[in-house]
UniProtKB/Swiss-Prot annotation:
Taxonomic classification: Eukaryota, Fungi, Dikarya, Ascomycota, Pezizomycotina
Coiled coil: none
Ranges for region deca-GX3 motif: 74-114
Subunit structure: May form a complex with LTO1.
Record protein name field: Protein YAE1
Ranges where the record places region Disordered: 222-241
Species for this entry: Pyricularia oryzae (strain 70-15 / ATCC MYA-4617 / FGSC 8958)
Primary localization class, coarse: cytoplasm
């Protein structure tokens, strides 16, 4: 018996293919396109990876989550400990230098403010005061032009190669401090300001404090009252330019 299968016409919409083998007709109910059918929700949730679903997991499902949590916690703890140690060490090292620098800058600006207040009509003093305030702002005086990121000065300091250098040496060598020291000295000479007046009063104050510490209130009061008239006289002379 010779069988010659003859495919019959079919429609692409019915999903059925007919084949004739002799007098027998067979219906193939599974179209080839069924293997590639797509789900309408694949665009939202993604398609299932049939091949990947057969692979076996070599570690528990929570292992990766726990590992990530421990890594994050360890990183935070390390940053916290390192920050505390670094900040304290940096503060201990930089506080003295920063305080000395701020004191010198404040001294220069303060004297210029006093001169500008004593002579309100002088435009030169007003301009110098405004310029000094800009130069001695924290952003300017502590800027990258004069300091490394680690807090070391980048400008030359006299004596730093051969001997000991103290904070005062570093501060007075700062380009902005050196610049305004010259300007301030010129204005002091022009207006006849007595800078030793403040030094003498400081000596008197130190004597009063020392007598109080020694338990001699009467001596401390005598030292304070004996210098009061002289102090007032010098203040009047200094303001009468």
């Amino acid at each position: 018996m010779h069988m010659n299968p003859t495919p019959l016409p079919h429609s692409e919409d019915d999903g059925v293919m007919f084949a004739s083998i002799g007098q027998t007709t067979l219906a193939l109910t599974e179209p080839p396109s069924a293997l590639h059918a797509t789900d309408t929700l694949d665009d939202v949730f993604g398609s299932e990876d049939v091949q990947g679903s057969t692979s076996f997991t070599t570690e528990p499902s929570d292992m990766r989550r726990l590992q990530s949590e421990h890594t994050t916690a360890g990183y935070r703890e390390g940053v916290t400990v390192a920050k505390a140690a670094s900040v304290q060490a940096g503060f201990d090292e930089g506080f003295g230098l920063g305080a000395t620098l701020g004191l010198s800058a404040g001294e220069i600006v303060g004297v210029l403010e006093g001169l500008a207040a004593a002579v309100p009509g002088d435009e030169r003093l007003a301009a110098l005061l405004g310029e000094a305030r800009g130069d001695f702002s924290a952003r300017s005086i502590f800027g990258a032009t004069y300091w490394d990121p680690n807090g070391t000065w980048t400008y030359p300091v006299p004596g730093q190669d051969g001997g000991d250098v103290i904070f005062r040496d570093v501060v007075e060598a700062h380009p902005l401090i050196a610049k305004w020291r010259v300007v301030l000295n010129e204005q002091i000479q022009n207006w006849g300001v007595r800078c030793d007046f403040f030094a003498e009063d400081q000596v008197v104050d130190e004597e009063v404090v020392s007598q109080k510490k020694l338990g001699n209130p009467a001596t401390a009061l005598k030292a304070a009252t004996s210098t009061a008239p002289a102090t007032q006289s010098r203040m009047s002379d200094a303001l009468q330019w």
